[in-house]
């Protein structure tokens, strides 16, 4: 039964990811005054299917000097971790309702660094290794900010359980009261998922696609799926943390529809930023985090610790 549940849970995510690639190409096309994919199927709707067939029927190749085991394991692990992040997310009901859902997500997002590092090192290519090292430095750096923001939200929520955030936001979105945290969280998710303007790990002009430069066919598709799955997962997390709404037990489909629409709006914002912004310089990226975001998140964390004590009240305990 659990296997069926997992399949029913992962299949729509992978389907959404497949069509997200089409939406991205269409949105970027119209923003650049062109059509985007419009040949395969009506209005180009079958383009993701054609891409999948092409990638998974090609023969996967690897460099003769690469480390075989690590080279093959890295994309599989990347996709597995990306899909596992969805397990505790309440949409409005989670696959497994974890008491420490916030910590589980933090742990998995930290582990997602390893497949990138393995792929860069195992490829035995200087471009792949430089891209991997950039990715590790960037991801670990922004993990600190994400963890501090999550700690602040946890203090407001009074629990590590993600489902409680729906109850905390019954009267008002946390976006209204914690908008500086929400802004820093959104920018940090862009950096965490290696999206424009923080796509330094995949700098086409300087690193020839970055850590996955030596990958082709199925393994490349797995990295691609993992990246876009992480984008959707981070936007789903943003919706849960800052745009949550109380669960209507009489009409549960309304909750799911509301959650999906909010996540899609945030994903569209990701695409809009990609079409509009140039790439940051690497030193600017690090300065933004260590000199701006980290002091601010620490200050807000202390603020949210001190307010309940000062007002002689505690966060809502469920």
Swiss-Prot record:
Membrane topology according to the record: Multi-pass membrane protein
Transmembrane segments: 3-23, 69-89, 100-120, 136-156, 172-192, 223-243, 253-273, 294-314
Catalytic activity: a ubiquinone + NADH + 5 H(+)(in) = a ubiquinol + NAD(+) + 4 H(+)(out)
PANTHER family named among the record's database cross-references: NADH DEHYDROGENASE SUBUNIT 1, NADH-UBIQUINONE OXIDOREDUCTASE CHAIN 1
Compartment(s) where it occurs, according to its Swiss-Prot or TrEMBL record: Mitochondrion inner membrane
The keyword Chloroplast appears for this protein: no
Protein name: NADH-ubiquinone oxidoreductase chain 1
Entry EC number(s): 7.1.1.2
InterPro entries xref list: NADH_UbQ_OxRdtase_su1/FPO, NADH_UbQ_OxRdtase_su1_CS
One Pfam family linked to the record: NADHdh
């Amino acid at each position: 039964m659990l296997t069926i549940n997992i399949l029913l849970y992962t299949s729509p995510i992978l389907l959404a990811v497949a069509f997200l690639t089409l939406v991205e190409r269409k949105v970027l096309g119209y923003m650049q005054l062109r059509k985007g994919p419009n040949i395969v199927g009506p209005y180009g709707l079958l383009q993701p299917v054609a891409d999948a067939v092409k990638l998974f029927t090609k023969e996967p190749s690897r460099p003769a000097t690469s480390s075989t085991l690590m080279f093959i394991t890295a994309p599989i692990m990347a996709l597995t971790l990306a899909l596992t992040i969805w397990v505790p997310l309440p949409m409005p009901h989670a696959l497994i309702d974890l008491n420490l859902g916030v910590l589980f997500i933090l742990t998995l997002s930290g582990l997602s660094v390893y497949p990138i590092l393995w792929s860069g090192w195992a490829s035995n290519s200087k471009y792949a290794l430089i891209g991997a090292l950039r990715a590790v430095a960037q991801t670990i750096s922004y993990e600190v900010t994400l963890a501090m923001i999550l700690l602040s939200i946890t203090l407001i929520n009074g629990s590590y359980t993600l489902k409680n955030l729906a109850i905390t936001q019954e009267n008002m979105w946390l976006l209204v009261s914690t908008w500086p945290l929400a802004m820093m969280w959104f920018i940090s998710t862009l950096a965490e998922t290696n999206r424009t303007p923080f796509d330094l790990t995949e700098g086409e002009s300087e690193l020839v696609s970055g850590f996955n430069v030596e990958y082709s066919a199925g393994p490349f598709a797995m990295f691609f799926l993992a990246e876009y799955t992480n984008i959707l997962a981070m936007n789903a997390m943003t919706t849960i943390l800052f745009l949550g709404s109380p669960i209507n037990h009489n009409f549960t489909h309304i909750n799911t529809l509301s959650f999906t629409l909010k996540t899609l709006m945030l994903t569209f914002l990701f695409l809009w930023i990609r079409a509009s912004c140039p790439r940051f310089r690497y030193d600017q990226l690090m300065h933004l985090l260590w000199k701006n975001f980290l002091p601010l998140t620490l200050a807000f964390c202390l603020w949210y610790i001190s307010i309940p004590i000062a007002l002689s009240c505690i966060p809502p305990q469920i």
